UniProtKB/Swiss-Prot annotation:
Lineage of origin: Bacteria, Bacillati, Bacillota, Bacilli, Bacillales
Subcellular location: Cytoplasm
Protein name: Glutamate--tRNA ligase
Similarity comment: family membership: Belongs to the class-I aminoacyl-tRNA synthetase family. Glutamate--tRNA ligase type 1 subfamily.
GO terms classed as biological process: glutamyl-tRNA aminoacylation
Amino acid sequence: MGNEVRVRYAPSPTGHLHIGNARTALFNYLFARSQGGKFIIRIEDTDKKRNIEGGEQSQLNYLKWLGMDWDESVDIGGEYGPYRQSERNDIYKKYYEELLEKGLAYKCFCTEEELEKEREEQIARGEMPRYSGKHRNLTQEEQERFLAEGRQPSIRFRVPEGKIIAFNDIVKGEISFESDGIGDFVIVKKDGTPTYNFAVAIDDYLMKMTHVLRGEDHISNTPKQIMIFQAFGWDVPVFGHMTLIVNESRKKLSKRDESIIQFIEQYDELGYLPEALFNFIGLLGWSPVGEEELFTREQFIEIFDVNRLSKSPALFDMHKLKWVNNQYVKALDLDQVVELTLPHLQKAGKVGTELSAEEQEWVRKLISLYHEQLSYGAEIVELTDLFFKDEIEYNQEAKAVLEEEQVPEVLSVFAAKLEELEEFTPELIKASIKAVQKETGHKGKKLFMPIRVAVTGQTHGPELPQAIELIGRETAVRRLKSI
């Protein structure tokens, strides 16, 4: 192996880009870029049953959307292609035939029923199920007899007996396995397709990977891949297994867990910003030196240290993601926030797709009211709901405010003031509130809170005069008089 760092993200095209896979890609990307190395994307599509049409392109599109680029892959080619495993079968054939020739692999004619029976018997005896090796030493005659019966063989790797397979994991430290607990494993299925562990080991060697960074659910695959490397006399790459991502109940993220949005495409659809997601995912199981939490892509590349990958599970905190995204939204100018949010108002049917100049101005003012507090684009629909309703509902907290004794006087005087205004502007609305204070003697919360609750249905919200302007004189007066 040369000195240049070469790492890969190797998705299966089985669906959309999951947050956990995005993190794996991101840490490999940051490691490569921070070391001046190469980041490669390889498509692992050997499991044909699970592949989804468009899955590959969707994954690549959303890696780009997040802000990653790569040096070699299916879309741009490279020196060590093809980068799609389904196009590499002739390459794998050469290597498994070499193992067969050297006696390091063998043909296994066991049927699924025989293997299942063996497995059940081992479990009944309290043993860890593994292949017994009963076809390890078949004679040529026995093999021919099985073939004559119409049996198709798989090919198994001959696991050396009594061996310790150890490696120093970047994240976990020293990890070791006993070969006797593994059993001879299949490297080529009966249909001639290489298995995951075999294809990955061959590809990682031929593509000159120096490091393999992936989720800890792959730890059990590592000794098998190491043994394949060793069987060919190849240098073994450095492994690092990242901890799981867990939800707020400290349970492993499951695709069935609906408390967390798990696919990058969904975040895009909800109006999260790619830069914010990049930032948030970059801190899922990795921590910088110091307290700062907001970093650009360039800053991440500059400070990324693979040795600071966390040994503890990474907590996916939805509140934290919203906070991070809000920081990025606040940094946008109003035109950008309108571009982010307007499609969501249109999709929800709140505003039309063709807006007059007057309507555009109203929508811009509305969106600007919520610019500072907006967590993500689609949230604008919920935040601004009160501006699109004829009638509003008052919750218990709001009702309690409206039951205070000064309320009828405050609201009736304020309604009269609004009706008298020649122009309905925030400045004149603010002056009207002050006039109510002067006329009634009520001030502070006793004055502002009933007005806010009566007109908006909420006990807190954006600047009150601006909100009342956008609600409109007629609606505001009607709501004030209905209490």
